[in-house]
Swiss-Prot record:
GO terms for molecular function: UDP-N-acetyl-D-glucosamine:N-acetylmuramoyl-L-alanyl-D-glutamyl-meso-2,6-diaminopimelyl-D-alanyl-D-alanine-diphosphoundecaprenol 4-beta-N-acetylglucosaminlytransferase activity; undecaprenyldiphospho-muramoylpentapeptide beta-N-acetylglucosaminyltransferase activity. CDD domains: GT28_MurG (cd03785). Its EC number is 2.4.1.227. Keywords: Cell cycle, Cell division, Cell membrane, Cell shape, Cell wall biogenesis/degradation, Glycosyltransferase, Membrane, Peptidoglycan synthesis, Transferase. It is an enzyme of class 2 (transferase). Pathway: Cell wall biogenesis; peptidoglycan biosynthesis. GO terms for cellular component: plasma membrane. This is UDP-N-acetylglucosamine--N-acetylmuramyl-(pentapeptide) pyrophosphoryl-undecaprenol N-acetylglucosamine transferase. PANTHER family: GLYCOSYLTRANSFERASE, UDP-N-ACETYLGLUCOSAMINE--N-ACETYLMURAMYL-(PENTAPEPTIDE) PYROPHOSPHORYL-UNDECAPRENOL N-ACETYLGLUCOSAMINE TRANSFERASE 1. The gene is murG.
Amino acid sequence: MRVIITGGGTGGHVYPALAIARGLKEARPGVELLYIGTARGLEADVVPRAGLTLATITVQGLVRRQVWKNIPALVKTGRGLGEAWQQVRRFRPDVVVGTGGYVSGPVCLAAALQGVPVILHEQNAFPGVTNRLLAILARCVCLTFPEAASRFPRRAKLVTTGLPVRPEIIQADRDSCRQHFGLRPEQLFLVTVGGSQGARSINGAMLPILKELAGCQDVSLLQVTGRRDYEAYLQQVRTQGIDLAKYGNITIEPYVYNLEQALAAADLVIGRAGASFLAEVLARGLPSVLVPYPHAAANHQEYNARAVARQGAAVVVLDRELKGGRLYQVVFELLRSREKLKAMAAAAASLGRPGALEAIIQVILKTVESG
């Protein structure tokens, strides 16, 4: 079996693609995989590191608010379509899997025009423009959120599978992870992950929360600031008179490589509403306070957050509300109500789809078998 996987630009498109690639290798050890991306996106770094062959094509994203700037992008996309055509023709795949991003457009279009079955995966509640345009050419569109269905053409074949998460997220043992962080059984563990984009506003809103929690025996806090803001944030913490060494229940890190351990140990999570992060939070059955990144394309993070909040698994705090103290209010209301946290955790667990990867792999295998 020969499979082309394409998707790029950001982690939201690349990491689900890598999870699918790993799932295909496990399901069909002899599978031949080719990843098609760009030389400038995240995929240029992480795909070779994952042991996959990467081919690149020329493509450039469109500028939505300044149409006149799109002429060079359209020229590059035309060139990219020709390059994608050659890659598909040369590799002769049984199926092409696209996870979104501008690079997947030319690749999936070239495949469809050559009669190769195309399967798409959409990560967000508000689907990306590339997947919406490609949907009528695809054999199947795998959705993370059922709410996304209404934004696709009626002719599109849709199935809700969820978003594949790393096996480590699901397999991490809660008890051993809590021991790793030195937590007592009755102690609540609050984890704040600002994300690579726009962590600064969340960091600033966390300062009064840190001040209130400093020395609290009932709550431990891990805050991940992002590398860019780490030193400046530590200085802000010191300016507020918070002595981290003295109190011991607050840990501030620029980045964590063991996020699966932090999520397994957590009782409440604060973070952005990117699809991959949300899928991991829900797979762990975690209550969350979601602060959508306000500059995400088509405001898709707010759509993601609202979809989870409607089911009772999260509380949404908009970025513009952070300066008004709403994050402080929401966090302490939740920390004071273990029953509320328990109810939100149950709702999150009901939304989590730990079998998402297997469901997507089955869609791919059935498509190949049917020809």
